[in-house]
Amino acid sequence: MLWAFIVWLGALCIYGSAFDILIYAPRMMQSHVYFTARIANVLAARGHKVTVIDNVFRYDVDNELSSDIHEIISVEPSPEVTKLLNTGSLPTILWNSKASPEEQRTIMEGLGHVHRLQCTHLIENSTLIPKLQEIKFDFAIHEVFDSCGVGILEVIGVQKTVIVSSTGPMDVVPITLGISDTLNTPSLLSDYGSYLSFFEKRRNLKFLSGMLNFHEMQDSMISPLFKKYYGLKKPTGEIMRQANLLFYNIHEGSDGMRMRGRRSFDIGGIAFKDQKNLTMEYQTLLSDPRPKVLVSFGTAATSSHMPQNLKNSLMTAMKQMNNVLFIWKYEMEDNFTKQEELTTNIIFKKFLPQTDLLASSKIDLFVTHCGQNSLLEAFNSGVRVLAVPLFGDQHRNAKLAFENGLIEILPKSDIETPAKIVKAVKTGLEPNAKLDQNIVLISSLLRNSKENAENLLISTIEATYSTEFPPNFSKFPKNYHPNTLVRLIDSSIALVFMLFIFVFVNHFRKNYVGFKYPLSFSTK
């Protein structure tokens, strides 16, 4: 009876101090959706009253929200967005991209165009904002990958905010909030790790510029609309600096050095899914005595949209390794899969229970695009990784993990050559005591990370918003824009070059102009 009273009293205290929380969750990229949904579900399970804006870009991505959520307000996808995404061009573009500032900028411009079309649709055709203006929220949570949330929260009067990121810090966040040094911070889009050499800084600034351009091009279209319909006056940067907390989907065991603000927290592991029992089909598959390699490139750049030459090269390489069983996530049945039905060491699957397979201790190597969630899942399960980074943060994720001695990298360009694939897979499967030691270490660090991340999220949020005026980033120093620093570097180089030419010409004129050589012979 006493225990029942204590439980009742605890529940009363929790619900009595529950917050009204608004979470903006654009349903576009699976990893982003799941990370944000996990935060919503954890807070709702705690007893807080959580309302979620489910801004739907794609119906083939589930919103992952639990029944504990108080209310889900859905926004239908824009017809233009649906048309663009149904062309299937995005995965093809991602597969054909290169790790250069120019190409990553182009990719982000394409994604930014999709986001601003959906935001325009939301502002002009949805009743969402007027409805939200009638509700009082204590604070809101959003991921700034989609800039629409910044404007929505401001026009409905929510100025206490939490910024979350399903990857490491989005470049726009540390730069705008003043918690990093623009010149020395590797961009999320870059292929750099923890440090930048002197000669890498300018190229890195171009990556930073590309990422900021992704947000600026969204802002250039949607800010005037927010101003037109709802009288928004504040610039996006000023609104972002009202944030009180930052949460990142990273873990110190696999991440690199970063400059941190006082209110920045790592909650890598919070998105781990609970392990389920494998079906009899997969149990039978995993009983095969051969080494088993799981191949999955995520939900954005799907295997079925891989360029044909890369598919053929992968297939050729796999066939050369008959003693290895490959389980390949390939999202559709097509001529490519049908012509390989008789291949005995390759299994195609439209869907894979990735978490459960990795946790089975039967997977010897995971070939992955190196998305943050996939990488952390593999480390948590103690599975070796062969990374094939394709776009966005994947190149940097791979570089950081490689620096920490946790993975091997197969550059996408090497997939064109079957011999290089064979060599990389064999290297990934052969004994490597140092690699195994590092993986055991990171796996042990991640063992309780889900519970720890949930507790950190809850305790930090509840402590922060127990005060009426929690501190924000409005007083932090402002950083220079990457483009400004690029111009400064280029101007400095040009000035040094001009000074060199001036000194050289001046030296030449003084020493050689008008100089008369002595005669080397005499006349008689």
From Swiss-Prot:
The keyword Glycosyltransferase is annotated on this UniProt entry: yes
Signal peptide region: 1-20
Membrane-spanning intervals of the chain: 488-508
Subcellular locations according to the entry: Membrane
MF annotations from Gene Ontology: glucuronosyltransferase activity; UDP-glycosyltransferase activity
First-listed, main subcellular location of the protein, grouped into a coarse class: membrane
Known catalytic reactions: glucuronate acceptor + UDP-alpha-D-glucuronate = acceptor beta-D-glucuronoside + UDP + H(+)
Xref: InterPro entries: UDP-glycosyltransferase (IPR050271), UDP_glucos_trans (IPR002213), UDP_glycos_trans_CS (IPR035595)
GO cellular component: membrane
EC number: 2.4.1.17
Residues that carry a glycan: 125, 277, 335
Membrane disposition: Single-pass membrane protein
Key words, A-Z: Glycoprotein, Glycosyltransferase, Membrane, Signal, Transferase, Transmembrane, Transmembrane helix
Record-linked PROSITE patterns: UDPGT
Entry-linked PANTHER family: EG:EG0003.4 PROTEIN-RELATED, UDP-GLUCURONOSYLTRANSFERASE UGT-56-RELATED
Family according to the record: Belongs to the UDP-glycosyltransferase family.
The name this protein goes by in its record: Putative UDP-glucuronosyltransferase ugt-56
Organism: Caenorhabditis elegans
Gene: ugt-56
